[in-house]
Structure formats: C-alpha cells, structure tokens
UniProtKB/Swiss-Prot annotation:
UniProt entry tagged with the keyword Nucleotide-binding: yes
InterPro entries, per the entry: DNA_mismatch_repair_MutS, DNA_mismatch_repair_MutS-lik_N, DNA_mismatch_repair_MutS/MSH, DNA_mismatch_repair_MutS_C, DNA_mismatch_repair_MutS_clamp, DNA_mismatch_repair_MutS_core, DNA_mismatch_repair_MutS_N, DNA_mismatch_repair_MutS_sf
GO cellular component: cytosol
Record organism: Brevibacillus brevis (strain 47 / JCM 6285 / NBRC 100599)
PROSITE patterns for the chain: DNA_MISMATCH_REPAIR_2
The protein, known as: DNA mismatch repair protein MutS
Length: 862
C-alpha cells in the first residue's frame, strides 16, 4: 500500500473495515468511490467511470456524485440490496495538517433506512433475525424508522421457521447459530458467537429479557448487534419489545398470502388490485402500516374480533361523525417516524412543527371517539395522551414556518432566548444602518442609482453605474471591483459595520442551531409517550377505514360462531366487485359445516369462476378475522385457524422443482399442518401428471381430508369421475360453475350451484383464446370420435380411451373448414398483442376478468 498517495492509503484503511459495502468517501463537494466500488457503482447508478492518479503504476478507477445529490444515489443502491458507508471529513480542511481526518459516520443498509425520502409512507421497513439455540428458533423483527420491535420463538429448523420472518417482508436478514442457512434472495448477515453474547441483552431491554427464552434473546441480540455496528447514534426510540405467540393469529404460508393477493398482486407486485388496496381508506401513514399488519396477521380471538366489529358498526352507522373523524385524522402526520427521526437526531424544525400540529388535533379526535360510546374506541381515547406540555413548549420555542435546513437560522421564536433576541436586534440595526447609508450616499453624491449590495465573496459594497462614475467625489470611496457596467466601492466605515453585522449573524445562526438541538433533545425525552399515542391513533384510523369501505361497498357484519358452520349468502369477491361495475357482479352462496358439507367438489369449465369463488371465500374469512365487515348479504362464520391454498401453476427453478413437484409439496404441507378448524383451497390437484395418476392422487387427497383431518375444503377439478365421491364419501358435496351453450357459443354465468358439471368445455375456452380455426375444428372432430366410442371421461376404462385415440390417430384428417382471412383493426391488433404476451401461469382470475372487461370496453368504442 506504500506506493499509494496518503489520501488513497487512508481510503484503503477505512475500506478494509467495510469490505461488502460501497464506501462514499467525502472529497470536498463530492462523494468519491474508488477501485471495485467505482466499477460496480458506475454500472448500478449509470454514472461515468473515470480514473485518477493514486500514486501507483496505473490510474485508479473512480466515480463520484455531488454531496447535495447523494441521497438519491444512495437510495438507488439500497433498492438493489446494497449497503452504503458514508465517510465524512471530521475536521476543517483549513486546520488539517496533512490528510484531512475522515471517519465513517453511518452505514446505511436496506433494513436500517431512517430518512423519509427512502421509505414508503404506508409500508414498514423491517429487518429480521433468526437465531437457533437449544432446539428452538427465535424470530425478531424491527423497523428502525418507527421503533417497533417484535419477538417470538418456534420449534423446528430455521428453514421452516423462515416463513414467520418473511411475514414481515423484511429488507434484510440476520442469522445466528444456524447449522445451515436457508435459501433467500434477501441481503443477509451472519453473526457468530464471538460477536454476540446470547445472554447479554441490551440494557434497554434487560428487564423484559427475563421473560424471553434463550432463542428469543439471541434473536434480539443479533438484531441489536447488527444495528449497533451500522448505526453510530442513539437508538432510544426503539420501543419496548413486544413478545407474541404466532399461534394467536391465523396462519398462512407465503404461497397462500401471495395467492390470495392480500397486500400485492401476483402479476405486477403492486398494491393496486390487492385486498389492502381495497380496504385502505386510512388517513394517516401509521394507520396504513397497521392495516397491512392486521391483514397479514388475522386474529383468532372471538372477543377481540367482536370488539373491533362493534367499533366498525358504530362508525359505519354515523356518517357525519365518521366524516369529522376522518378530517381530524387528516391533520395528523406520521408520528411514529417523526418520533424516530427526533430520537435518531436527524429531525429538522419542520418535523417538530408537524409534531406540534399533529398533537393539536388530539383533543378533538378524542371527543369524536368518545361520542361513539363503544368500548374499543373509548378505551383508545381514554389512553390518548394529549401531550399539552409538548405542544406549549414547541409553540414557545419554534416559529410556525421554519426553513428546511437547521443551519440557516430562522427557526427560534422571538422571546425564547434573550441573547438570541439581542443578536437579532444587532443584525436588524445593522441592516437599518446599511439602508440609511445608501440613502445618505445618494443625497451626498447626487447619484440616484447608487445602491449598497452584498455577496459572500466581497461582503457589503457600494455600486455605481459606469455612466455616473464621473460624479463620484474624488477620494470618497475605495475601488473594490470593476464590472462591465458598474464599479463597486467600499469605505472603512462600511467594512467596520459589515464585520459587526456578519459577526452577529454568524453567532445568531450558530446559537439558533444549538438552541434547536436542545429543543429536539428535550422532545426526545418523551418518545415513549408519542409512540403510545401514535399506536392508538393508528388503531382508530384502521377501524374508521373499515367502516368507510364497508359503508361504501355495502358490506355486512359477520356473525362469528363456534359451531363449525360456514354459511355465506350472496357473497362477493371484494376486489373483483370493486373493479367491475357493481350491477354486473354475480354473487354466490356457500354453505359448509363439519359433517354433511365438509368438502365442496367444484366442477365446471375454465374461466367460469371456480378460482375466483374459492379466493372469495378465503378473503371473506380474512376480512372477518381482522374485524372488518364482509361483502355478502349475510355471513355466519366459524373462526379458522389456518388457510392453505394450492391455486395456479408455478415451478421453482431455483429449488429445482417442477410445477407438479411444487403442487405436491404444497399439498403435502396442507395435509400435514391442517386441523379440523382450517380452510383448504385446492385447485385442480393432479393435473400435472397422467390422467389416471392425477385422478388417483386427487381422490386420495379428498379421502384423507375427510377421514383424517376434517377441515373445510374447496376442491376444484376437471376429473368428473371424482363427482361420484359425493355418493360414497360422507361430507363431500358437488357444486358447479354454471354455464350455457347458446348458438354454439359458451356463456359463462359465474354462478355456483348444486350438482356436478357435465363437461369441461375446454374447446370453447380455446376458441375464446383465438386458437387457429384448424386446431379448434380438428379438436372437435377428435372429441366427437372419443364420445362416439364412449370415452367421455365419465369412468370408462383406460383401454377404451387408448383404443379410441389409436383409431383417431390412424384415421384420415377430416376436411376442416377454412375461414376467409380477415384483417383486424388497430384496436383488435393491440388486444391480440396483449393476449399473446399474457403469462397464463401468473394471471389470476381477477386479472383475467379485469383484462376481459378492459378489452370489451375498447371494442365497444369502435
């Protein structure tokens, strides 16, 4: 390293401690990156890669970004899963002897982002830790931006427990004590025993740690250790630990949550089109985040659910009160993240004004809540701290409209600090003297255009235009600067007054900063109060959101029962209904119980609504178990402990699993974990193998569920032979997605009714997909031949099917009617192009219906 310049040697010494991190190295007004960091960053950020002489034989790769624009570039690297270490100059270059001293002041990782501009308002930014100790795995998760911290412990290996951590949608994972690391694409860090004492929980949590088992303590420690090594400032805003039991909540694996599109769509990975999108009528950012958490963790406690439902009912029934409540909530800023920034030390004066304005809304908010006269809302209101002392303190200390920067002054209110007021007076008097000087010099010289100006280079000056220079009395001024159209002058008296003004302003700005930091530190002492208040406001915000959407969409309060009955009258898919016009949506009933109607065997053609019907029932269950009203005319529901879904086709290329293998693994998971209180949705099990293998597996799965588990199950299939189970297996009932043939065309009615379907209508669906006419008519010819030989798929032997196919294969191809070539319009071409690019494996029924509806509207405009 000796061949490098001292500055590059300094860079390499610092970089050695951050090998897996981009080092943003401050040089003047830029952050520079060198060597491999520069090469990779230039690609990731699409910035120019240059080089510089570093003292070695070759030029060093280098790229850089302006310091004032660095946040945008850092955010881009964080989005791509990278870490960034910010290395600042920690001494004044003018006073430095040799190389300016530099230190890493913070390490920013995807899971430790604190700045609002890097975060999404209504999404948490969690990081999670898994720690395996003494046969159990602790799972801890925290969001540094809000101060939340949760911990639990589960039996089993980390691979199976990983799903619990993934429910937080973490941006980073930390592992401790794992024999084998689970496969994940998330940025991960391994903490070893030399870095972590399992039993030495941070003093902030020491008291609570007494109630944690060693695996939970290890998980918390792993998180705290990682955060401590990356963040070099106070973490006092990190809330007291919330220990929970995962069994208190309705369990869904990652595939089920994804398949039901609870918080994002399968196709676009966006919020729009998900259940969260439909229900999110929250007015605050913290309410939006809490809504997401409630959706991802539905409750099992009937008492808690009834309390929530009663609050929703009260708010739904009083539109005027709810409107006032929403208006009041709209005045509340993101208290959780404001508290985080205040404690972290990066809040500015505007943040504190937002805090004050939010707190000023609390008394009115409490009054509206108390008016509902419901236990949940009254308890929330009674526990709300109005923080009047903080409001008064901030109102006395800070002006109403401070600047963004805390280094410009203009933040502290007159009367807060006596010495600051004196400096303000001195500054004002100095500027008054300047104005008087300007007027006096105009009168003395007779030059009306004379003016006194200021810039940061020359300070105060007297400016006279070239046309008036001859009128300047000799010896009156000292020339300072010549411009194209003017001359600038100074006088000893002006420079003396300038020194006084600038000294006062410099002292004033520095004192204002010190006073602001003191104000911020004083408010930081009350972080727990602010966090408790934020949590209560978020809860009422979610409850009013449920009431608002329930009122607008005509949802009803579900009746929660313990009998095992599950009856929905005129149920609707909440999201599909919202996308389609209300009057066009076809509602459907469902009736299930623990004995006679345990398994609904659903038959019918593709696109007839089977999958939508199944998802609809699961979503209604989730909505009821988060305390929301449901889309139905009437609903009597038993509480469900787990939901399993096997809907859609997807392979696992990374894991080396085929579509059929994934199907079998997910079905096995449901069969192993489900209980009599679970809800299972199985879509076309067995379709990925031969007909008879698939049919045998499907029947065996149904029998196992009926005889060994007893879970309520919806099972869709194209194996019409399975419909015979309704006559031989207690608890199995046939229902079908009704459709009609009219003039050779298939009409989907989207109505689920009792009984089995006679056909699957696959050729009709292929025709809708605009398969070539030759293929459609040839398929019809083959089907006719199969039906003539008795091979209709209604239970004939495999040999009959094989004979029929052999006969058809050896028969001459019948003449197929050729249709004349028709040229499509521009609209039709555009629709066909979309259709060709459509990935059917990742398209949900809701996506398909939305597409069909949009295409139909396009064609109607022709």
């Amino acid at each position: 390293m000796a061949q490098y310049t001292p500055m590059i040697q300094q860079y390499l010494a610092i970089k050695k401690d951050y090998p897996d991190t981009f080092l943003f190295f401050r040089l003047g007004d830029f952050y520079e990156l060198f060597f491999d960091d520069a090469i990779l960053a230039s690609r990731e950020l699409e910035i120019t890669l240059t080089g510089r002489d570093g003292g070695g034989s070759e030029r060093i790769p280098m790229c850089g970004v302006p310091h004032h624009a660095a946040d945008g570039y850092i955010a881009e690297l964080l989005k791509k899963g990278h870490k960034v270490a910010v290395c600042e100059q920690v001494e004044d270059p003018k006073e430095a002897k040799g190389v300016v001293r530099r230190e890493v002041t913070r390490v920013i990782t995807p899971g430790t982002m604190m700045e609002g501009k890097w975060l999404t308002d209504k999404e948490n930014n969690y990081m999670a830790a898994l720690a395996q100790v003494e046969g159990r795995t602790g799972v801890a998760a925290c969001d540094m931006s809000t101060g939340e911290m949760y911990v639990t412990s589960l039996a089993g290996q980390a691979e199976s427990v990983l799903d619990e951590a993934l429910q937080y949608r973490p941006k980073e994972l930390v592992f401790f004590g794992l024999a084998a690391l689970p496969k994940t694409a998330l940025p991960s860090t391994v903490v070893d025993a030399h870095q972590l004492d399992v039993f030495a929980v941070d003093s902030q949590y020491a008291e609570q740690a007494k109630g944690l088992d060693v695996s939970m303590r290890a998980a918390v420690n792993a998180l705290l250790f990682y955060i401590g090594t990356t963040q070099k400032r106070s973490l006092a805003h990190m809330r007291l630990l919330k220990q929970y039991d995962a069994k208190q909540y309705l369990q869904m694996d990652g595939f089920s949550r994804r398949n039901l599109e609870l918080t994002e769509t399968i196709r676009d990975k966006t919020k729009k089109g998900s259940l969260l999108w439909l229900l999110d009528r929250t007015q605050t950012a913290m309410g939006g985040r809490l809504l997401r958490r409630w959706i991802e963790r539905p409750l099992l406690s009937r008492d808690q659910l009834e309390a929530r439902l009663s609050a929703v009912e009260a708010l739904k029934g009083d539109m005027l009160l709810r409107s006032d409540l929403r208006t009041c909530l709209d005045r509340v800023y993101d208290l959780e993240r404001l508290a985080g920034r205040i404690s972290y030390g990066n809040a500015n004066a505007r943040d504190l004004i937002q805090l004050r304005m939010s707190l000023e809304a609390v008394p009115e908010l409490k009054q509206y809540m108390i008016q509902t006269n419901t236990p949940v809302l009254m308890e929330l209101a009674n526990g709300m701290d109005e923080c009047a002392d903080i409001v008064n303190y901030l109102a006395h200390a800070l002006v109403d409209d401070p600047p963004i920067s805390v280094r410009e002054g203009g933040m502290i209110r007159t009367g807060y600090d006596e010495y600051l007021d004196k400096l303000h007076t001195a500054s004002r008097e100095g500027k008054t003297w300047i104005a008087q000087l300007e007027q006096g010099e105009r009168e003395a010289t007779g030059i009306r255009s004379l003016k006194v100006g200021f810039n940061k280079v020359f300070g105060y000056y007297i400016e006279i235009s070239k046309s008036n220079i001859a009128n300047v009395p000799a010896g009156r001024y000292e020339r300072k600067q010549t411009l194209a159209n003017a001359e600038r002058y100074i006088t000893p008296e002006l420079k003396e007054r300038e020194a006084l003004i600038l000294e006062a302003e410099e002292k004033m700005i520095e004192l204002e900063y010190q006073l602001f930091v003191a104000v911020r530190s004083e408010v930081a002492k009350h972080i727990p109060r602010l966090q408790n208040l934020a949590e209560r406001i978020a809860s009422v915000d979610v409850l009013q959101a449920f009431a608002t959407v329930s009122d607008e969409r005509g949802f009803v309060r579900p009746e929660l029962v313990e009998s095992g009955d599950y009856v929905i009258t005129e149920g609707r898919h909440p999201v599909v209904e919202a996308v389609l016009e209300r009057e066009k949506y076809v509602a459907n009933d469902v009736e299930m119980d623990q004995t006679n109607r345990q398994v609904l065997l659903i038959t019918g053609p593709n696109m007839a609504g089977k999958s939508t019907y199944m998802r609809q029932i699961a979503l209604i269950t989730v909505m009821a178990q988060i305390g929301c009203f449901v889309p139905a005319k009437q609903a009597k529901l038993s509480i469900v402990d787990q939901i399993f879904t096997r809907i859609g086709a997807a392979d696992d290329l990374v894991g080396g699993h085929s579509t059929f293998m994934v199907e079998m693994l997910e079905t096995r998971h449901a069969l192993q974990k489900a209980t009599a209180k679970s809800l299972i949705l199985l879509d076309e099990i067995g379709r990925g193998t031969s007909t008879y293998d698939g049919m045998a597996l499907a029947q065996a799965v149904i029998e196992y569920i009926c005889q060994k588990i007893g879970a309520k199950t919806l099972f869709s299939t194209h194996y019409h032979e399975l419909t015979g189970l309704a006559e031989t297996l207690s608890g199995v009932v046939n229902v079908n997605a009704r459709c009609e043939e009219r003039e050779g065309k298939l009409l989907f009615l989207h109505k689920i009714e009792e009984g089995r379907a006679d056909k699957s209508y696959g050729i009709h669906v292929a025709e809708l997909a605009e398969m070539p006419t030759w293929v459609i008519e040839r398929a019809r010819s083959i089907l006719t031949g199969l039906e003539a030989n008795g091979s209709t798929g209604n239970g004939n032997a495999a040999s009959d099917v094989q004979m029929s196919l052999e006969t058809l294969w050896t028969a001459p191809v019948a003449a197929v009617r050729e249709e004349p070539m028709q040229f499509a319009s521009a609209e039709e071409e555009a629709i066909m192009a979309e259709l060709r690019e459509l990935d059917l494996n990742s398209t949900t029924p809701m996506d398909a219906m939305m597409k069909l509806y949009a295409w139909k509207q396009q064609l109607k405009k022709r």
